[in-house]
Amino acid sequence: MALKTFKPVTPSLRQLVIVDRSELYKGKPVKALTEGKISSGGRNNLGRVTVRFRGGGHKRTLRNVDFKRREHAGKVGTVERIEYDPNRTAFIALVTYEGGAQSYILAPQRVKAGDKVVSGDSVDIKPGNAMPIGNMPVGTIVHNVELKIGKGGAIARSAGNYAQIVGRDQGYVTLRLNSGEQRLVHGQCYATVGAVSNPDHMNISLGKAGRKRWLGRRPHNRGVAMNPIDHPHGGGEGRTSGGRHPVTPWGFPTKGKKTRSNKRTDTFIVSSRHNRKK
């Protein structure tokens, strides 16, 4: 889908660039595949703010998206329509399987209403089909990749995202991610062929602060603009750079500080995403 720009009849329209969603389905989602979603406003179960600068925004209905693609394995599904989902950057596709069962899946690029999709151990290599990643040829573009067998897709799920199979060895597949990282994934983990829809999402410009508020994002004020009581970067006469390496409001290093602590899975990372920056 293309991008939309507007004549600058108002200041906010001058900068506005959004994705043209005129081809998407304009009705409501399938009620059986949805559930209510209560906005947390960035608060936890104690009512304390755990994520700053969140709150407000439009009320959303949660669409139950099938990330596993195993329940209807072997059944041919027909894409009924492509829909907008307010809970993610990608579009979703409503699929009706043989027997009448329906589910939502992440809509891949170049998949449209009327197309057939299927999942199973040995299916055709075409966008929208899901199978164990070990059964795909080297060079295949994939998305919605599982990290644990049967747990559901975890890698390459956002708009325009994908990973590429670059090798295969001893039951594991080597994937190259968009970040540059190369990672081992078990060959029995499911993945879907193709790239995720809505690749133009990266080019949008919201044009005004209010549009960010509609998405549930509140103003993000900088530490250097605060008083010393409120932030380690606060205070000083006139504009300052903070006077120290960037830290969080609680004094922990940030902006470049490595935070990965899951050493148990380090063995699956063949090449770190940081290597290409050296």
From Swiss-Prot:
Stretch list, region Disordered: 223-278
**Cysteine pairings via disulfide bonds:** none
* InterPro entries referenced in this protein's UniProt entry, alphabetically: NA-bd_OB-fold, Rib_uL2_dom2, Ribosomal_uL2, Ribosomal_uL2_bac/org-type, Ribosomal_uL2_C, Ribosomal_uL2_CS, Ribosomal_uL2_dom3, Ribosomal_uL2_RNA-bd_dom
Going by the UniProt record, its keywords in alphabetical order are: Ribonucleoprotein, Ribosomal protein, RNA-binding, rRNA-binding
Q: Which GO terms describe its molecular function?
A: rRNA binding; structural constituent of ribosome; transferase activity
Q: Name one GO cellular component term.
A: large ribosomal subunit
Q: Which SMART domains match?
A: Ribosomal_L2, Ribosomal_L2_C
Its domain of life reads Bacteria
Biological processes, Gene Ontology terms: cytoplasmic translation
How does the annotation summarize its subunit structure? Part of the 50S ribosomal subunit. Forms a bridge to the 30S subunit in the 70S ribosome.
- Give the matching PANTHER family: LARGE RIBOSOMAL SUBUNIT PROTEIN UL2M, RIBOSOMAL PROTEIN L2
Listed NCBIfam families: rplB_bact
The entry assigns this protein to a family as follows: Belongs to the universal ribosomal protein uL2 family.
Q: Which HAMAP family match?
A: Ribosomal_uL2_B (MF_01320_B)
What does the UniProt record say this protein does?
One of the primary rRNA binding proteins. Required for association of the 30S and 50S subunits to form the 70S ribosome, for tRNA binding and peptide bond formation. It has been suggested to have peptidyltransferase activity; this is somewhat controversial. Makes several contacts with the 16S rRNA in the 70S ribosome.
Per its record, how is this protein called by name?
Large ribosomal subunit protein uL2
Q: Which organism is it from?
A: Methylobacterium nodulans (strain LMG 21967 / CNCM I-2342 / ORS 2060)
